[in-house]
Structure formats: C-alpha cells, structure tokens
A protein has these predicted regions:
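Bacterial N-terminal signal peptides
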Residues: 10-21
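Bacterial N-terminal signal peptides that target proteins for export
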Residues: 1-12
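Predominantly soluble domains enriched in secretory-pathway, periplasmic, or organellar proteins
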Residues: 21-362
Length: 362
C-alpha cells in the first residue's frame, strides 16, 4: 500500500482550503480630498488629488499668490494676490533680525507695485475654476476665514494694517493699523478676535473681529510668521523665525506663557495644530524639516525631513497626512502622520508658498 508523505498531505490540505475559501486583502479606499497649492512666482494654483497624489489641475489666479485658505464647507478656495514684486531677503544682523534701510529695496518695490493686482482670488473648488477677485486692501499676504464663512481677516504687508472684508458685499468693513510687516493671521476658536503677527518688531496684535478695534497686544522675538490655536481655544502657538523658537500663549488672557527652543538650525514659519489637539506641527524653513511638538508640554517630539525651506503646511481632512510647500525645490512634501515620515513629493513648479486641503466633491 502506498503511503503519502505527511508534508505532501499537509500541502494538499492547505491548497484545498485556499481553493474553497479564497482570501483577498480588503480594498482600502483612498483619501477623498484635494490639495490646493499657491505658487508665488508662476501666479497659479496646483491641485493635487489626495487619493493618488497626481496633479489634477493648474489654475491661473493672478500675481504672486501666497496665503491660501478654504471656506468652512470646503467649497471655495481663497488666495491672497499681490502686485508688489518679490524682494530679495533682507540682510540680517548678528541675532538674525532683518536690517531695513530707508531708500532700499522696500521703497523700490513700492514704486513698482501693481496695486490693481492686489486682492483675494476666489476659486470654485469642485470645478477648479477661478471666479473673481475681491478687494482686500494693499498687498495682502495672508488671512483667515471666519467660522461662519462671512468675513476675511487679512494682513496688508506693505501698509502695516489688517483689513476685515465682508465676502458677500466684497467691501472692506474695517481697517486696523498694526506694526510693520504683518503676516500671520489666525481667528480665535470662539470667533471673537483674531491675531495678527508682525514680523519686524515681533508684535502680536489682538483685534476684535466685529469692530476691528485693537483689544491688546504683546511681543515675542522678531519675525513671528504665523499663529494657530488649539481646538479648545486655551492656547495659541506662534513661531519666531529669527530666534528659532516657539511661543506658547495663553489665548484667554492673550499673554505669553513661555518660549521653547526648536532644534538647531530651525527657522520656523507656519504652525498647525492637529485636529485632535494633541500635537503641533511647524515648518522649520531653512532647516528643511517639520518639527513635531507635544501640545500640552510644547516639548519637541520629532523632526521630519522634507524638501527645501518648507513654508506653508496643511493637514488633510482625515488628519492622516501633512502637506508642506517647499518653495526652492518646487515641490510639495507628503508626510504620513502615523509614522511621521515623508512618503512622497509632488512637483508644483513656480515656488509653492501656501497649501490647503479640502474634501473632494467631484
């Protein structure tokens, strides 16, 4: 009588099981969102498909697009446009602070500025189509959108001012004077005020979002580039580029609590709090990294290597990825936030400046 090897018998049984009960890996749905990137030098937006990271469209919008944000429902993209020419970076002193000279490049740029190009561009996110430009004051650089989607709070860089614009009427309702080179804008979670970060002196202005009046101000080290609030509204984070540090602010009383040194070489730019409020991410500029901070302690947990001089950053609607605009390398880094690793780069020619991610309704 022929005998069957135990090994052959086991293999045969396994094959039978596989034939009767085939097992397939479950399909994983891709991210259902799109990413809009403002390209400062080419005057357009790059649209990236969140599912496969392909470039879905390029949308011409106007001169020097920088700050870019979405309406609360994600259906409209707003982008700051400016006719003021791009300047060479200012000379820095021994502490890394900019040196400004009367009659220098800043004055030349003002003389050459095309003020007719200034405004906020309005883009239909689903159709990926530029619709119109609305007034926004002189040289708008960045802005924030109110929680109800009715107003824009805008930093007017060359005017040392901040504008409040009614989107429906397309009119400037209030103009608040701040200090030199206002850039970052962030609205408090309760909507009652907004912060404006002013680079030159390190002033942070707190402005009433209804009246446009100054509530208070406080100072940090020079070149604060941006601000963001934790979801609960109790804390704000403001990076100081020159000092290479993060400022932690009591956002209830609008007072500086402490500063935290970032890793050596960091020149922090754009800050974003995670949707769950547990971590804070900041682009480190010339260091070519994203710094990850614990939101409770402000301790630096990790640094993530990305492209050249990351500027604007955005977190995907599902909270799983971070996108960083790398101006000098003309690309966008894609970071997996679970592993905190860069997983891809997508070309975005034209010096990418800002980035925003919204649900894809196509």
């Amino acid at each position: 009588m022929r005998t069957i090897s135990p090994l052959l018998l086991r293999a045969a049984l396994l094959s039978a099981v596989c034939l009767v009960h085939p097992v397939a890996a479950p399909a994983q749905p891709g991210p259902d969102y799109q990413v809009f990137v403002s390209n400062e030098r080419s005057g357009d937006l790059t649209v990236i498909n969140g599912a496969d990271l392909s470039v879905a469209a390029t949308i011409p919008v106007g001169k020097r697009p920088r700050g870019i944000h979405a309406s609360p429902d994600g259906k409209t993209i707003y982008v700051a446009l400016s006719g003021t020419p791009i300047s060479a970076p200012p000379q820095l002193d021994a502490q890394g602070n900019p040196i400004f000279q009367k009659g220098g490049d800043d004055d030349d740029d003002d003389a050459k500025a095309d003020k007719a190009a200034d405004g906020i561009g309005v883009v239909d996110a689903a159709r990926r189509k530029f619709l119109r430009k609305i007034p926004a004051g002189s040289d708008p650089e960045n802005f924030a959108v109110s929680a109800d989607g009715a107003r824009l709070f805008i930093s007017n860089e060359d005017a040392g001012a901040a504008s409040i614009v009614n989107i429906a009427s397309e009119k400037i309702e209030h103009l608040a004077l701040v200090s030199r080179e206002p850039e970052g804008v962030a609205v408090t979670p309760d909507g009652g005020a907004f912060y404006v970060t002013c680079e030159t002196a390190g002033d942070i202005f707190v402005i009433d979002s209804k009246t446009g009046r100054e509530i208070t101000r406080f100072s940090v080290h020079p070149r604060p580039r941006s601000a963001d609030f934790l979801p609960g509204g109790a804390r704000a984070f403001i990076p100081s580029e020159s000092a290479g540090e993060m400022n932690v602010v009591d956002a209830i009383h609008h007072k500086l609590l402490r500063t935290v040194a970032l890793p050596k070489g960091s020149r922090p730019m754009c800050v974003k709090a995670a949707p769950d409020g547990r971590k804070v991410y900041v682009s480190a500029g010339r260091a070519g990294t994203i710094c990850v901070l614990d939101a409770e302690t402000a301790e630096v947990l990790n640094t993530i290597k990305v492209g050249a001089r990351p500027w604007g950053i955005a977190i995907s609607p599902d909270g799983r990825r971070l996108y960083a605009a790398n101006g000098p390398s003309d690309d966008v880094s894609v970071v997996d936030l679970a592993t905190e690793k860069e997983i891809a780069r997508v070309k975005s020619p034209g010096s990418p400046w800002g980035v925003v991610a919204v649900p894809d309704t196509n």
